[in-house]
Amino acid sequence: MKPAFASLVQKDGVRILDGKKVVMELWFREAAPTGPKNTEDAISLTGIPHGSYVGIARFPERGSDRRGQSIKAGVYTLRLSFFPPNGDHQGVSPQRDFFVVSPASDDVDAGTALAFEPLVALSRKASGTPHPLVLSVWKTDGEGKSGLAQDGEHDTVLHSKIGSIPITLIVAGKFDH
């Protein structure tokens, strides 16, 4: 991981286990990036600018996103994005927030928020498909407890924080599309 990215995350990450096997490790930013409040519909993380670097993910072995796309073993950056309100994503989730997963080796500037198209292009390098790798996320109301929980029939979520902002992130699950 490039020092400019690693220096911004919390020292203690989170390990997601399946039994005793580590399937994912996550480190979120110590302080959340800030910007003008986003007033678009169905956005929960309104104070974090689109395309901002929010954390690091490491997959020690092959994993997958909620769409079933394969994620190769490796280290990735996480950046916040919002799926476009063009009708292609109806029923995916009540909120439009998600983390775009991109190869850490190809992400160049932790301090620059990426526009939608360059961000999607960067993630396509990881997915090898026309669709970026994504992890669904939303702001949690109140303080909430940190840790893993079951959400509905198919999803396992992580309750954590980016800086002081409480979030819920789907770390395992499947969306039937």
What are these regions (language model features)?
Residues 65:
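Short, acidic, Ser/Thr-enriched surface-loop or helix-capping motifs
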Residues 74-81:
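A short tyrosine-centered beta-strand micro-motif
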Residues 21, 50-54, 71-73, 94-96:
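Extracytoplasmic
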Residues 39-44, 53-62:
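N-terminal post-signal-peptidase region of extra-cytosolic proteins
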Residues 47, 88-91:
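Short consensus segments that form the blades of beta-propeller domains
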Residues 84:
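Short active-site loop/helix that positions an aromatic residue
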Residues 1-45, 101-177:
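Primarily secretory-pathway and cell-envelope proteins
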